[in-house]
Amino acid sequence: MATISILVAVYNAEKYLHKCLKSLLSQTLHNIEIICVNDASTDSSLSILNAYAKKDERIKVVHLSQNVGIAKARNAGLRISTGQYIAFVDSDDWLSEDACEKAFDVFTHYPLTDTVLFQVKNVYGNKDVDFIMPSFTTLDGFTAFRESLTWNIHGVYVVKRELHLRFPYDESAVAYSDENVTRLHYLNSREVRICNGIYYYRQHLGSVTHRVSLRRFDYLLANQSMKQQLEALNVSDRILDIYEEVRWRNVIGLYMFYFLHRKKLDRNSLQQGLAIIRRSWQSIEVYRLPRWLVRKFGYIPFQKSWLVFRLQEETYFFLRALLGKNKEQL
């Protein structure tokens, strides 16, 4: 049994894969397994993985014949993992050589800890920028969940095996599955701590979260999936209220995305995106939202009339544009 299993979903990553794998094989904590799931890559990624696996038995390669996306790929790796703890590393990212050891030390010294965060450096070309979080030693699960809703704390960590098996990656939310599982891991952790190991997170302007495409509206679908999972867990009304406010703000945020970028999207994408916004708007439980928020222009639900709601949003974002205030936050 490995101490830590590292899940690496791989799709056409030949450009970055060597750096990623070398950083994992160089870990000062030797008892790890590296489970690389090749998600039907069309480049030389599989050949690279097989070559590394021949040199080091800690690397296990799973090859998927069809491209299934990162959530299903990671879950395929999770199912065959043996580690006491589970981490993920994207195939274009890498770890400091002591990252796993630092995380394991925290688990060893604090047995109530279920999740240990890495330090994160966002990599822009040759420039590294620290992800700044509020200073903390320990967070309870609820606080970590709440802080993750606005990403005051990030979602890059090592988690106890039992918790990850209970909450695998959300396969219903293709583009944002990691956000949902992160929040479920935090919410169900007894203690969340941080270590000094570093995760280097390469930033790409062409990623789903940066480009203008229909996939951006998937965020609302992921939010709906998250709400359903919270309800299935019978969480408190306090948690549901907090998350419903997040969902509502994201509905407004995605309408702003629609407002700003509709000239860049084809007609079919616009119709589909607007339909997703409408379904989310219809499903909002207004009674869970803060009264001051639903009285604020731009955020009034107008549940009885989609037309009136749209008129409000068009006016709201037109006025914001005149004032230079339309800045995307998703």
Language-model regions, residue ranges each:
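Short, well-formed alpha-helical segments that are part of the catalytic scaffolds
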Residues: 12-26
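Catalytic core of nucleotide-sugar-dependent glycosyltransferases
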Residues: 197-204, 211-238, 250-284
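A conserved acidic beta->alpha catalytic loop
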Residues: 23, 38-48, 66, 90
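Glycine-rich, basic loop-to-helix element that forms the pyrophosphate-binding segment
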Residues: 64-81, 88
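Membrane-interface aromatic/basic loop that binds lipid-linked glycans or pyrophosphate carriers
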Residues: 263-330
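Flexible acidic/His/Gly-enriched loops in nucleotide-sugar-dependent glycosyltransferase catalytic domains
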Residues: 96-168
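Conserved nucleotide-sugar donor-binding catalytic segment
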Residues: 141-219
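Short loop->beta transition adjacent to catalytic acidic/histidine clusters or analogous donor-positioning motifs
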Residues: 2-7, 25-36, 44, 56-60
